[in-house]
Amino acid sequence: MEATPPAEQLAGRPAPRAGFPYATWGAQMAVGGVLLALAAGFLLSIPAVVIDNPAEGDLSTAANVVVQLATALGFLLVPFVIATRWGEASVGQALRRLGVRGFRPAALKWMLAAVGAYLVFAGVYSALFGAPEQEDIAESFGTVPVQVLLIVLAAPISEEVCFRGMLFGGLRTRMPRIAAALVSALVFGALHALTGLSAVPPLIFFGFVLALLYEKTGSIVPGILLHMLNNSVALLGQ
């Protein structure tokens, strides 16, 4: 007698996994989730933009802060909703599916390897093409504490949840490691193009390394920490 297929397979979704990847959604949902996250951030920022009336000039500091927070919120809410299977799973289950997990001390060696690989790539890239340039968005957020909140804390956490936890995690259920890491990194880099095209290749490599780090350590937390470190250095250099 044939066994009845799990409900997840009947619904076209990957069955829950004991090991990596932890995602219970597939590649299509992962890509769609990024689009939904961007749309959510845009919709959440509309009131601030309308009230600020940017037709009179650049957005005010308050409006810029709200837009940045709205973007981060979109990158957090949509992955969380997808990970809960639209409310079926608990908060803890959703976080674990997104890679928000503890990690072993051995993860430190992979973090150091990731930093080393990125520094080598950045050095070679700068030697060949010159130092990448990005728009200085920090000043548009006002005081230093607010800059730290948005650039060093909110951005790394929300982007790792969205691009590594949701996107890479979902792609990994259907694609080989390198391919999934590359696709997620390309999306991550492309979405930063508005702040400076020359910085896109290093950001793509950074996203690629962080995806591999996630799989090696089984947690997005090491990637969040390195992302925070990277943004801290960038903020100090501006």
Segment roles from a protein language model:
Residues 13, 20, 26-27, 35, ...:
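N-terminal hydrophobic or amphipathic segments with adjacent small-residue motifs
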